[in-house]
């Protein structure tokens, strides 16, 4: 299991391609759930979490090469770490290796990436750029979305990468090298 936390997960598709693994982007369950329920309805939360939990259980117990899960983590909330630890524990109980990759980028770069063609293609709710940018600003003010430099996090296999100026290929290679993971042979 690879958990991509932070707010700069542009690297995931390349990394996913290199490793032949499944991808559960946090927005996948959100995009589906928002078509059925308003975000404020309790059913929205129940369905969203049920989708994720089911995917986690199927991948943890199945014979799959892996799963990448991207997640926006509020580093100032213990419940976020508890949630991620529960996901990690599920995979570890099924003899899977787990890795946590924190990706961060400057806010201005995140605004640019938020408008990218690929992001808008795959994330319908982000197509309202005015709303999306306002939501980014509000979320960044309300939560601490990255760890502090030198902060000790409760993850066994962890790396933090500032990918503000890095290409996705570079970041994917850094992750593979750091964790000594072989990728696809071209």
Q: What is each model feature region?
A:
Residues 174-185:
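C-terminal alpha-helix
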Residues 52, 56, 168-176:
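Short, amphipathic alpha-helical "lid/cap" segments that border enzyme active or binding sites
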Residues 9-10, 23, 98-102, 158-160:
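Conserved beta-strand scaffold positions in the cores of enzyme catalytic domains, especially
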Residues 47-101:
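Glycine-rich phosphate-binding loop used to anchor ATP phosphates in small-molecule kinases
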Residues 116-171:
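Small-molecule kinase domains that catalyze NTP-dependent phosphoryl transfer to phosphate-bearing small molecules
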Residues 15-17, 29-30, 74-76, 104-109:
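Conserved nucleotide-binding/hydrolysis micro-motifs of P-loop NTPases
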Residues 92-115, 161:
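Conserved phosphate-donor/acceptor-positioning beta-strand/loop module used by diverse small-molecule
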Residues 3-60:
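Conserved substrate/cofactor phosphate-moiety recognition/catalytic segment
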